[in-house]
From Swiss-Prot:
InterPro entries: G_CP_dom (IPR030378), GTP-bd (IPR006073), GTP-bd_ortho_bundle_sf (IPR023179), GTP-bd_ribosome_bgen (IPR019991), GTPase_MTG1 (IPR016478), P-loop_NTPase (IPR027417)
Signal peptide span: none
Intracellular or extracellular location(s): Cytoplasm
Gene Ontology BP terms: ribosome biogenesis; translation
Organism annotation: Bacillus cereus (strain ATCC 14579 / DSM 31 / CCUG 7414 / JCM 2152 / NBRC 15305 / NCIMB 9373 / NCTC 2599 / NRRL B-3711)
The protein's name: Ribosome biogenesis GTPase A
Family: Belongs to the TRAFAC class YlqF/YawG GTPase family. MTG1 subfamily.
Domain CP-type G: 14-178
Pfam families recorded: MMR_HSR1
Length: 296
């Protein structure tokens, strides 16, 4: 399954982000804690270059806590300050502000030394669609400023938002890359809802999600769908889930589309518990002594 989705406003956003960088003190890169690397646009590294960066793992309430700690350690080893948050619940907002102050301290100290009065920190928020940028901005600003939704592509225009007297945020539309050459990355993004369902084959996505859970979270899969054992044959697994949850067509036939929608809706809604779809080890990174590494 090759996924292509690159609306015109995303291409425009890349140009605008590049233009705005000279105004920015720090970049807040928002990723999905359930897939911290797959939810990063590789173009971001090219665009941001040498700006101080804070990597924020959002939706930590839906991710595997043990793996979230490993990912924070991973980003720190790469030289990026990193924290985990739950923007929906407003958790981690103070940590973001504190981390940004640390990242711009050297620059602002130089400004003061030159007799320049410190101004508000100017931060750029970047990320792919549906990682929670608008929700984060609204929580930081304590106002319903940015449009929010669980559909990718909700934020379509750039805007400056004041966060108290100490910070100004520039929101940007989510920037996806033109084509997912890595099929696994595309499937992971599709599973968490970062890509519009309307352009996907949901059965393919559901097959990936079920096989992933079978391998990594089998007990949750069995408990949620009342399975004594998980059938090896994927069609039999769909049949068992569809029958258990009443996803039927006329004559008692299993409705595979409805079953696929059910599985993905429940997974995205947290009904199957906290889970993370990738680990640093998969990318050749060994993260040691994670428990000793404290978050910022």
């Amino acid at each position: 399954m090759v996924i292509q989705w690159f609306p015109g406003h995303m291409a425009k956003a890349r140009r605008q982000v590049t233009e705005k960088l000279k105004l920015i003190d720090v970049v807040i890169e928002l990723v999905d804690a359930r897939l911290p690397l797959s939810s990063r646009n590789p173009m971001i590294d090219e665009i941001i270059t040498h700006k101080p960066r804070l990597v924020v793992l959002n939706k930590a309430d839906m991710a595997d806590d043990r793996l979230t700690k490993q990912w924070i350690a991973y980003f720190k080893e790469k030289g990026h300050m990193a924290i985990s948050i739950n923007a929906q619940a407003g958790q981690g907002m103070k940590e973001i502000a504190a981390a940004c102050k640390v990242l711009v301290k050297e620059k602002f100290d130089k400004m003061v030394a030159k007799g320049i009065r410190p101004r508000a920190i100017r931060a750029l928020i970047v990320g792919i669609p549906n990682v929670g940028k608008s929700t984060l901005i609204n929580k930081l600003a304590k106002k319903n400023i940015a449009k929010t939704g669980d559909r990718p592509g909700v934020t379509t225009a750039q805007q400056w938002i004041k966060v108290g007297k100490e910070m100004e945020l520039l929101d940007t539309p989510g920037i996806l890359w033109p084509k997912f050459e890595d099929q696994l990355v595309g499937l992971r993004l599709a599973t968490t809802g970062a890509i519009k369902d309307s352009i996907l084959n949901l059965q393919d996505v559901a097959v990936y999600a079920l096989r992933f859970m079978e391998k990594h979270y089998p007990e949750r899969l069995k408990e949620r769908y009342n399975l004594n054992e998980i059938p090896e044959d994927i069609v039999e697994l769909f049949d068992a889930i569809g029958k258990n949850r009443g996803c039927l067509m006329g004559g008692g036939m299993i409705d595979y589309d409805k079953t696929s929608e059910l599985v993905l809706r429940e997974l995205r809604g947290g009904k199957l518990g906290k889970m993370t779809f990738e680990t640093p080890e998969e990318f050749g990174e060994q993260v040691e002594d994670v428990e000793k590494i404290e978050e910022v």
